[in-house]
């Protein structure tokens, strides 16, 4: 759209163009967008000025997210630009029911800036919808990923500490490529025959760990929703097996199901 004669262009057309910029921002140069904002802000119409202000706010937010994303990529790249780095994280350590799940993800850390995956962060800080969207993108862009689980019966037999380490180990060992380095969240993975560095609050610092956190959570949440179809009295579709008041009361009323961790229910039954 040619904005040289902006005063002759209808508001609705300008708004459509503004919305297109936001949707297809990667196809525009930053300077080009800044020039458009300047023209919109000089228009005598208040509603057009508001479009310029909204576009400027969008640009600032995008710049902040770009910086945050680059920091997460650079955190992993500091270990070596030519390294294959896997991030690994688990979800489901604390629930009363269901498996513990881990994912390992190897990303291309040297992709061009605009090809990087934006909005990646600790899965707990994302909405369910955003996690689902990012799960698809991560799987598509990953060099390799693998999801592993340890079921409730094994958790009861071997204990949660063993199961937690085992599921992380299985996730890494199931990758189709062998990484040079494994980054884990919070603590080291024992008995792993690959160099391993653990990162405190890794899912907020490392793009690889945060990515693994997201696909592990999406996988487990969807699994618990499937279980809920035959065990709807426990509310697995929204509590994911965690010990909410509703869940605890259901256990007391109906007893445990086949996917409950009996070793976690000693204070309930």
UniProtKB/Swiss-Prot annotation:
One of the protein's GO biological processes: mismatch repair
Cofactor: Mn(2+); Mg(2+)
EC number of this enzyme: 3.1.26.4
Cofactor remark from the record: Manganese or magnesium. Binds 1 divalent metal ion per monomer in the absence of substrate. May bind a second metal ion after substrate binding.
Class in the EC hierarchy, top level: hydrolase
Boundaries of every RNase H type-2 domain copy: 83-269
Protein family per UniProt: Belongs to the RNase HII family.
Function: Endonuclease that specifically degrades the RNA of RNA-DNA hybrids.
HAMAP family, alphabetized: RNase_HII_B
Matching NCBIfam families: PRK00015.1-1, PRK00015.1-3
Protein name (Swiss-Prot/TrEMBL): Ribonuclease HII
């Amino acid at each position: 759209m040619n904005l040289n004669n902006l005063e002759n262009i209808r508001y609705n057309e300008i708004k459509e163009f503004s919305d297109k910029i936001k949707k297809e921002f990667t196809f525009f140069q930053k300077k080009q967008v800044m020039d458009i904002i300047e023209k919109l802000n000089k228009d005598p119409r208040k509603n057009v000025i508001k479009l310029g202000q909204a576009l400027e706010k969008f640009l600032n937010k995008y710049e902040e997210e770009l910086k945050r994303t680059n920091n997460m990529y650079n955190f992993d790249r500091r270990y070596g630009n030519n390294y294959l780095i896997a991030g690994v994280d688990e979800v489901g350590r604390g629930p009363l029911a269901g498996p513990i799940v881990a994912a390992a993800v190897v990303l291309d850390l040297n992709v061009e800036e605009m090809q990087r995956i934006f909005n990646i962060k600790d899965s707990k800080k994302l909405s369910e919808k955003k996690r689902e969207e990012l799960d698809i993108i991560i799987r598509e862009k990953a060099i390799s990923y693998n999801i592993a689980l340890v079921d409730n019966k094994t958790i009861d037999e071997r204990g949660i500490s063993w199961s937690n380490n085992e599921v992380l180990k299985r996730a890494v060992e199931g990758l189709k490529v062998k990484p040079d380095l494994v980054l884990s969240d919070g603590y080291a993975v024992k008995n792993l025959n690959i160099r391993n560095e653990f990162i405190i609050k890794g899912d907020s610092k490392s793009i690889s760990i945060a990515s693994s956190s997201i696909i592990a959570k999406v996988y487990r949440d969807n699994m618990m929703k499937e279980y809920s179809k035959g065990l709807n009295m426990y509310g697995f579709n929204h509590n994911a097996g965690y010990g909410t008041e509703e869940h605890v009361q259901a256990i007391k009323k109906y007893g445990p199901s086949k996917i409950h961790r009996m070793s976690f229910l000693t204070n309930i039954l």
